[in-house]
Amino acid sequence: MAIRLEDKKAIVAEVNETASKALSLVIADYRGVTSNKMSELRAKARAESVSLRVVRNTLARRAVEGTEYECAREAFVGPTILAFSMEDPGAAARLLKDYAKENDKFEIKALAVGGEMLGADQIDRLAKLPTRDQALAMLMSVMQAPVTKLARTLNEIPSKVTRAVAAVRDKKQEAA
């Protein structure tokens, strides 16, 4: 079924807008995946702020022009699904990596981050990135460690004085 030119332009504009706001892109081959399985994937994607699009390859190539994902143009071959991470750079990678483990017909082709295209074998690099909340928690623990150590050190001074006074008291009681 042919798509009208106006519809094609609208699809390209919509995907281009999504791509310009996205933090990362994962490209996968969905050949052989049932529609029920795809519906499950879409539901999981919505929950994790990942935008999934199935677009014709020629339209996808035009849509990524002028964005940082232009480097991924050669990966648009065969049945392709585009997964854009909107809030967390690793969200789409984690989602599709887990989905590919469950569905052996689903294959990750490539991923792109910051204008650099990475192979499917490097999906772990992106999937292992901590979420924003995890990164903030790590940063806070690193920042809190010196303060905690200082508080313990300052708390140790009165403890030492107390132990010294107790030792002097015990010594005087023994002498008396």
Swiss-Prot record:
GO terms for cellular component: ribonucleoprotein complex; ribosome. One of its GO terms (biological process) is translation. Disulfide bonds: none annotated. Keywords: Ribonucleoprotein, Ribosomal protein, RNA-binding, rRNA-binding. GO terms for molecular function: large ribosomal subunit rRNA binding. Part of the ribosomal stalk of the 50S ribosomal subunit. The N-terminus interacts with L11 and the large rRNA to form the base of the stalk. The C-terminus forms an elongated spine to which L12 dimers bind in a sequential fashion forming a multimeric L10(L12)X complex. This is Large ribosomal subunit protein uL10. It comes from Hahella chejuensis (strain KCTC 2396). The lineage of its organism: Bacteria, Pseudomonadati, Pseudomonadota, Gammaproteobacteria, Oceanospirillales.
